[in-house]
Amino acid sequence: MKKELFLLRGLPGSGKSTLAETLGGYHLEADMFFTNDDGEYNFDPQQLPTAHKWCKTMVEELMGEGVERIVVSNTSTQLWEMEPYLTMAEENGYTVFSLIVENRHGGNNIHGVPSESIERMKNRFEVQL
């Protein structure tokens, strides 16, 4: 059985979630923490650390169950943000694919992230080749 973890990174509006759905498998992202059962998105910046902890916990549970393909789509502008996922993947025998999704289609972020915040994310975005 081939086990894969896809880590999709990029700025808000780049198409991470759309690509994640295209890849198939089990899709998770911190934004899901803020979406209620009726599909309404209610972002609370004070809950962002909790949302990311929830996402990591869910990935850990899925890996423990041996789910073959897990796709995580978060901004992950800094490399340290991927480290917990890389560690879990190694411990559970997952091959990791890290993809940076660029906003080449002019997509808008659906969560109303202010342009100043996106600019800060862009300025701190780290890449390791």
PLM-predicted stretches and their roles:
Residues 11-12:
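The conserved Walker
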Residues 15:
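Conserved glycine(s) of the Walker
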Residues 22:
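Active-site signature of alpha/beta-hydrolase-fold catalytic machinery across serine-
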Residues 8:
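Hydrophobic anchor at the beta1->P-loop junction of P-loop NTPases
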